[in-house]
Amino acid sequence: MNVRAAAANVLYLVVDKGHSLSSALPAAQQTVRPRDHALLQEICYGALRYLPRLEMIANQLMDKPLKGKQRVFHHLILVGIYQLSFMRIPAHAAVGETVEGTKELKGPRLRGLINAVLRNYQRNQEELDQMAVSNNAGKYGHPSWLLKLLQDAYPQQWESIVDANNQKAPMWLRVNHQHHTRDEYLALLKNENIDSTPHTEAMDAIKLAAPCDVMKLPGFDKGWVSVQDAAAQLSINYLKPQDGELILDCCAAPGGKTAHILERTSGSEVVAIDCDDTRLKRVHENLKRLNLQAKVVCGDARNPQEWWQGEQFDRILLDAPCSATGVIRRHPDIKWLRRADDIAALAELQSEIFDAMWTQLKPGGTMVYATCSITPQENVEQVKAFLARTADAQLLDSDPDQPGRQILPGEEDMDGFYYAVLTKTRA
């Protein structure tokens, strides 16, 4: 399939139909040549990063909007504008290939319109680009509700957060400690001429200077290494799992943190629970590649009595469902799929899971509450409320007035993440 047509289809599914990019893009990649996978991904990710700017330009160039069945051609225009504005593809190729996309999208009558719009943009690009950043949505590439939330929560840092959200995320690796030390794996990468640097805090994390195909990584197929952001790897620093313990990874899919616990312990029994059976397949796949064993359970974390009849856990990692506002650079569709009222609904869900999971923790046990969100309502305020209503909960390693640690996007080149460590006091 024509790459530009495939990209337009992805944007249509995400923006108009509410599909996630993580589901729409892999399906579209199956329709294009393998050598075009990276190009398709770049166009889709980039167009979603700068969607308001592209929309403003497209609307300025058209007399009337494309509606109904023609909406996919509106997104084809966005694909063309993105290439001309942000990519190093020669203009004639960007326009020509985008116009060719009308054939496979079954819209040959719109060929002339799309060609005219893109040529018009070429002629007036400087003026149109200036117009497109004249308001905050176009300038910062975020919906107004999210921009206001960030400005209110982080008055000194919101611009750096927004900038980080619009950058390409680096590729972080997690070395499997059961096979190699991090220094040993750094040497293996050096032997393959893959430039990399270790993280200062996440003990198994390595950042690649440039992303690469995982099959080019030494021993990837043997389970020597996994791909995981350094911020997510810090869960092990806070959980501090010990050999021989009974440990629960709650809301575990796709299983990176489950695997990390197993890689760092010996003789532990790890239970991984998630309510999404489809996503749990990823947990099984990851554990199989890494040759690790865990008890994988499909169940609702709010009702542990339905899926767990065993003893209480020594440690629980509660990686709560959240707005994912800390990982926008990896999932730019989040900006357009989330709504302002989602935050309160997610906070309520987190609260219910928090309370239910606390009953499963042994006295003297440790719970790490974690999200990949940066909203106070899901993080600091959530933990404060839990501590206020839970008599046997004690916060560790942080100030009760500002509980936990909030990592912001781009900090040490990491994703945005939140961690709070609590212990259950003994009677």
Curated annotation (Swiss-Prot):
It is found in: Cytoplasm. Gene3D superfamilies: Helix hairpin bin (1.10.287.730), NusB-like (1.10.940.10), Sun protein, domain 3 (3.30.70.1170), Vaccinia Virus protein VP39 (3.40.50.150). It is an enzyme of class 2 (transferase). The keyword tRNA processing does not apply. S-adenosyl-L-methionine binds at C251, A252, A253, P254, G255, G256, K257, D274, D300, D319. GO terms for cellular component: cytosol. GO terms for molecular function: RNA binding; rRNA (cytosine-C5-)-methyltransferase activity. It catalyses: cytidine(967) in 16S rRNA + S-adenosyl-L-methionine = 5-methylcytidine(967) in 16S rRNA + S-adenosyl-L-homocysteine + H(+). This is Ribosomal RNA small subunit methyltransferase B.
